[in-house]
Amino acid sequence: MALGVPISVYLLFNAMTALTEEAAVTVTPPITAQQGNWTVNKTEADNIEGPIALKFSHLCLEDHNSYCINGACAFHHELEKAICRCFTGYTGERCEHLTLTSYAVDSYEKYIAIGIGVGLLLSGFLVIFYCYIRKRCLKLKSPYNVCSGERRPL
């Protein structure tokens, strides 16, 4: 067991070091190049490959502005289609579904079940108490008939 702790500490330290090395990013100032009427900013971040879900998407063109019903429209170049970023409370491909907050109304059935459970529990305790008292009284009874002060005529 003593050997297990240093090994786990060693593994944890190596994992933290690996994460730190992956998270380290050097930032270089952008290079601006004038191309016609367009200004292009190039940085090292443009050359980094990332997951598709995190890639930048541009705002939709005017013909797609009404595509999203309850959200902001963005055009994803790799998917080559308009996607929606829904406002809070809406879901769906075009943010057309309202997310309803659901809650359950307390019904009387729940309270009836709790009442029956408590009643059965109390009844069980009473039966156990009755059996205990009866057994105790039977142990205390003497096998002889002892009168408590009354005398019967012979």
From Swiss-Prot:
Residues 1-22 form the signal peptide. InterPro entries: EGF-like_dom (IPR000742). One of its GO terms (molecular function) is transmembrane receptor protein tyrosine kinase activator activity. One of its GO terms (biological process) is positive regulation of cell population proliferation. GO terms for cellular component: clathrin-coated endocytic vesicle membrane; extracellular region; extracellular space; plasma membrane. Disulfide bonds join 60-73, 68-84, 86-95. The keyword DNA-binding does not apply. Promotes the growth of epithelial cells. May stimulate the phosphorylation of EGFR and mitogen-activated protein kinases. PANTHER family: EPIGEN, TRANSFORMING GROWTH FACTOR ALPHA. This is Epigen. It comes from Homo sapiens. The gene is EPGN.
